[in-house]
UniProtKB/Swiss-Prot annotation:
GO terms, biological process: maturation of 5.8S rRNA; maturation of LSU-rRNA
Protein name (database record): Ribosome production factor 1
Naturally occurring in which organism (per UniProt): Danio rerio
SMART domains recorded: Brix (SM00879)
Location(s) in or outside the cell: Nucleus, Nucleolus
Keywords, sorted A to Z: Nucleus, Ribosome biogenesis, RNA-binding, rRNA processing, rRNA-binding
Pfam family, one: Brix
A GO CC annotation given for this chain: preribosome, large subunit precursor
Amino acid sequence: MKAVKAPVEEMDQAECEVKEEKSASGPCFPPTFSVSEIKNKQRRHTMFLKLKEEKRKKRMELKKKKKKERKALDDKAPPKEVPKTIENQRIYDETTVNPEDEEVAFDEGTDEFSAYFNRLTNPKVLITTSDRPRGRTVRFCDQLATVIPHAYVYYRRGLALKKVIPQCISRGFTYLMVINEDRKVPNGMVLCHLPDGPTAHFKVSSVRLRKEMKRRGKNPTEHSPEVILNNFTTRLGHSIGRLFAALFPHDPQFVGRQVATFHNQRDFIFFRFHRYIFKNEKKVGIQELGPRFTLKLRSLQKGTFDSKFGEYEWVHKRHEMDSSRRKFHL
């Protein structure tokens, strides 16, 4: 009996040691454990915060360690790593425009906007809406007319766009802008360059009118604004940039200190309207005037608007084109 008891006592001691180790180190989870497997909501939330704090501490320790190593090496320290972003990891597009390319210069001299850039025409814009627009869409159109010089707001009254376009051409308009709405909110824009096109269709989102903006400036003056176009690098983006540029007069009136910005980032075009505030000879600030909104290109059509027989240069096909987050078209 004594020979049998010895191994049993050793096993009991081993089990006690294991239990003590477990209690000291906290609960042990299997290697494939996930916080989402905890059914109790309060415990799950507590465990999530605990894991998040542990990750933060490890990250800070690693950061301090790297900082000490860099300080010790001084001039011999390796160069800092550039953070990876979707922009600098972008997949190269073969249609990226080189401004010095002769083919690009020839296309610019013969495309639909050449008359504007050769100063043969002055922009004149007609802004209209879908049928029976609501108050928010009407106010949005009125504010757009204060941003774009020589812009006039007219209401459709049930007329088809195919009948509106010939009337615009006969009255000397160079652009037709149609603001569509859904559930009383502006959600689309059709921008048609006259008389030869092209026609672009955009999705409109994140519309903020002037009254909805904090710390906005006074209403814009009638001075022609400066136009800034950012990150329109491909052939398609170049065409869209020229489409926006031709909305505004050739020579900005810098006395008004107003600037309209179309900033392309990940194929979203952010529009902002600012006024420069000069504090002294060296310092300058900007004051947003509004409105602000975001555009997403849906299609680009050759010629004027024709929903049935129009020839499309580019159409956004979401499931085919958005397979990679690092692929951009503008």
